[in-house]
Amino acid sequence: MTTTSDQNAAAPPRFDGLRALFINATLKRSPELSHTDGLIERSSGIMREHGVQVDTLRAVDHDIATGVWPDMTEHGWATDEWPALYRRVLDAHILVLCGPIWLGDNSSVMKRVIERLYACSSLLNEDGQYAYYGRAGGCLITGNEDGVKHCAMNVLYSLQHLGYTIPPQADAGWIGEAGPGPSYLDPGSGGPENDFTNRNTTFMTFNLMHIAQMLRAPAASRPTAINAPSGTPAAGRTSPTPTTDSQRRSRVARWLVAGEFRLLSHLCSRGSKVGELAQDTRTSLKTSWYLLGPAFVAAIAYVDPGNVAANVSSGAQFGYLLLWVIVAANVMAALVQYLSAKLGLVTGRSLPEAIGKRMGRPARLAYWAQAEIVAMATDVAEVIGGAIALRIMFNLPLPIGGIITGVVSLLLLTIQDRRGQRLFERVITALLLVIAIGFTASFFVVTPPPNAVLGGLAPRFQGTESVLLAAAIMGATVMPHAVYLHSGLARDRHGHPDPGPQRRRLLRVTRWDVGLAMLIAGGVNAAMLLVAALNMRGRGDTASIEGAYHAVHDTLGATIAVLFAVGLLASGLASSSVGAYAGAMIMQGLLHWSVPMLVRRLITLGPALAILTLGFDPTRTLVLSQVVLSFGIPFAVLPLVKLTGSPAVMGGDTNHRATTWVGWVVAVMVSLLNVMLIYLTVTG
């Protein structure tokens, strides 16, 4: 007969909720083979099997500046990716530093990583504790020369000095034949089959998971005293259950750890009293401006060339009639974007990852196919918009303009890939401001009548054509690729904080981020319609974007027309790079595939160049691209509302019931409007 204790003993331990970061300090850039990756795969594989969420990064792939300040761009360096990488460090309960031996010592990359960790060691968290408090650290070393223990002890000393908790047996390594002997993954090395290395790696991995789980446990669940010896009941207890020597040793160890935890808690709770000696993270976060950015990248999708076509057509044909649609669409979009960012912050997963996790492989492939088609249709529209702007400004052939747009957008993506998300956000935000200036500059010449503007806020239609344009505005505003992307942007920028003050703060900042970004995007969309209503109403040559440019030129002058074209160009360039970024995130989240950005750029550029070369009407193509986008809206918005309203997914941060109901209303309404757009377009 199997007892309950036997069943518990047989069940493998689970460490769900823990997150680990492995930093590989190899000197080889990706995709070169790193032998250290072999040991990382063994340890991280064990963690994944037991429920730990694992993140890995190769430090040499990133532009980490030399120095001992949190952000070296504030101390003379042009670029520094460490602030973005540091968020991944803070997101992890377990940090494992891994690297090779060089001349009997750690690599220069390892030393740089430790220096930058040291640079942030005086920062405090929201509870006034030092940043690395309550986290576990370990290391993995590979090489074919003496020094594995020397390197490991240097790393472990550094980690404990910085504030990490180091469990017993917190290191593992493999050392091959000294000299030019084989390295860990070389054929015949015996590295992956080495019992000693595998055993130590397993010990290290489980010790890290156990200590990290204990450090995260609520205080009430931690042991506070050693059990009294058998036969000697402690005060207030009935006679205790007899314990074995191994159980006593285990309890003593847990008690010692708990005592260390209480001592550290007492000391670190006084962190606010030693503010003069340490830089509080709240010093750099005392204003929320530092944390703004992800929503501004997502907002580019709301001012792309498709929006220009829909808004200008609406204003030229119906004046101020459909202004209310723009306002309503942006309010709905703000809710959708906030829910997307919230999902990324709370779960640590992008929307594609969260959806894919709940699907089998055939369903994931089908879902990925529709999402990628939508992302590619978006990218085609953005390239065409940029090509139109270049033809307006420089009289370039449309195919040449498309190539230039594709190349420039690739350069923007390179900024994100090489220089980090923060700089990418700054560049995209700058382009958003250029777009805003380009489409609002006309108000310095002629302002719309206030009464007419207020009249446009009253919901109403004038015939079937106005309904079609309203659906087009809605379809051009709530963009599926922006919904997918924003969840990943928020996670990558802010990390995945544990429940508590830090998460609440980041959610508040996210609401500000979304609110400000959507206010700018909504203002730009409204400006497009108002400019068209004021200057193009009744003209017969505004059916295309180029016709709208000429109308602006004739009514407002060359300067305003040039600014209009510059705004359109910035819209095409920025939205094209953001669309390609979203496509990569969709593929990574659903299929766990990564395609080089250049290859992806060429794939999506091909259809756009073919359309431009074959002489299809560019503006008509933009309209049709919005129809393709309409197919993807329900697949993005409906799962988002379901996931963020699920306590199983969001825990204590699940949507309020009212928010969920409003979310469902918005999701269904947007989906129905897009179905209507498809129907009206197909039926003419």
Curated annotation (Swiss-Prot):
InterPro entries in the cross-refs: Flavoprotein-like_sf, FMN_Rdtase-like_dom, NRAMP_fam
GO biological process: iron ion transmembrane transport
Pfam families reported for this sequence: FMN_red (PF03358), Nramp (PF01566)
Membrane topology: Multi-pass membrane protein
TM regions (residue ranges): 283-303, 318-340, 365-387, 391-413, 427-446, 467-489, 514-534, 555-577, 597-616, 621-643, 656-678
One GO molecular-function entry: oxidoreductase activity
Region ranges (Disordered): 223-250
Source organism superkingdom: Bacteria
Compartments in which it is found: Cell membrane
GO cellular component: plasma membrane
Purpose of the protein: H(+)-stimulated, divalent metal cation uptake system.
Family, per entry: In the C-terminal section; belongs to the NRAMP family.
Protein name in the entry: Divalent metal cation transporter MntH
Naturally occurring in which organism (per UniProt): Mycobacterium bovis (strain ATCC BAA-935 / AF2122/97)
